[in-house]
């Protein structure tokens, strides 16, 4: 059974690299989004919003976990091969390496030819900030920050939970992440209602985000600005500057490896937001840096997969 579980994870990774998220295939996240919207419209009002937000999170996680457990269990009961196929498809739906790579490349291509209008438009699909006035450097920064943050959120974190608990736990992670992305804002409407989703998403991302940031530095020795020990200290110091307890690890590591500075001034619906800068680089970012961030992501994800199997093998050997 353990062998089937490992085969499902590897197959899921290959499926995502090959197919990504084809539009013709029903995606669990779409269902999660509809479920969250349904409960949010009914519960995000009146008193006890924080408590209702906790109820939203628990309800969504219970439904997603119960359905995935039942589907995986029934599939394995029919046949081991069917179980592996179903579990692989479910795990693949939680990771987005191909989608992230393609989205970043969609920004890099027009940026490389100085078509800033098209590059801004493509960037607006993957970031929440205003993009209509961004110059070449800021467009590249937006794409690089997206790749860096989502290397963990969109790829390594779901793989981490897939190793621990298979497709059901990977889907629980993705459901939490979806709740956070939909209601985990700090504005008046969601400050209380989205509190539980945001906090639980932080908890689930704490370990994989740090492993991902450290692996980025470990796997790219030639890109590091300093010896490993010093680089790790720089990583920890720079990551703390990010307002998120987890996103800073991937972004700080990427900034150190690309020799650029991430963070700074962003504008959201005309409102300026200042964020601490991470990294020590001074060069202006270009489309080439976006391509290099994708290469760093790909190598880090492969290294993370190897790390997970080594960790899993060690735990299996001592238990």
From Swiss-Prot:
Pathway this chain belongs to: Cofactor biosynthesis; adenosylcobalamin biosynthesis
Keyword Membrane assigned: yes
Localization per Swiss-Prot or TrEMBL: Cell membrane
Membrane topology: Multi-pass membrane protein
Keyword presence, Heme: no
GO BP term (any one): cobalamin biosynthetic process
Pfam short name (any one): CobD_Cbib
This protein's name: Cobalamin biosynthesis protein CobD
């Amino acid at each position: 059974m353990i062998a089937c579980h490992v085969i499902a994870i590897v197959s899921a990774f290959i499926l995502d690299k090959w197919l990504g998220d084809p539009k013709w295939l029903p995606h669990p996240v779409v269902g999660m989004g509809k479920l969250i919207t349904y409960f949010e419209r009914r519960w995000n009002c009146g008193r006890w919003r924080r408590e209702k937000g906790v109820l939203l999170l628990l309800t969504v996680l219970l439904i997603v976990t119960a359905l995935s457990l039942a589907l995986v269990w029934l599939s394995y009961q029919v046949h081991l091969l069917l179980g592996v196929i179903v579990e692989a498809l479910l795990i693949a739906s939680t990771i987005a390496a191909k989608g992230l790579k393609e989205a970043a490349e969609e920004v890099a291509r027009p940026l490389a030819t100085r078509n800033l209008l098209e590059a801004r438009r493509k960037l607006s699909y993957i970031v929440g900030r205003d993009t209509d006035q961004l110059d070449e450097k800021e467009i590249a920064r937006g794409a690089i920050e997206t790749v860096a943050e989502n290397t963990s959120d969109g790829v390594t974190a779901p793989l981490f939970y897939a190793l621990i608990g298979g497709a059901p736990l990977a889907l629980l992670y993705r459901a939490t992440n979806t709740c956070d992305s939909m209601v985990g804002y700090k504005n008046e409407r969601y400050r209380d209602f989205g509190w539980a989703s945001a906090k639980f998403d932080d908890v689930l991302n704490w370990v994989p985000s740090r492993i991902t940031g450290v692996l980025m530095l470990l796997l790219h020795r030639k890109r590091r600005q300093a010896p490993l020990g010093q680089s790790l200290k720089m990583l920890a110091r720079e990551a703390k500057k990010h307002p998120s307890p987890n996103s800073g690890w991937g972004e700080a590591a990427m900034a150190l490896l690309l020799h650029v500075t991430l963070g700074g001034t962003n504008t959201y619906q005309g409102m300026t937001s200042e964020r601490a800068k991470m990294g020590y680089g001074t060069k202006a970012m270009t489309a080439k840096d976006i391509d290099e961030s994708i290469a760093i992501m790909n190598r880090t994800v492969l290294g993370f997969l190897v790390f997970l199997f080594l960790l899993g093998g060690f735990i299996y050997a001592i238990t």
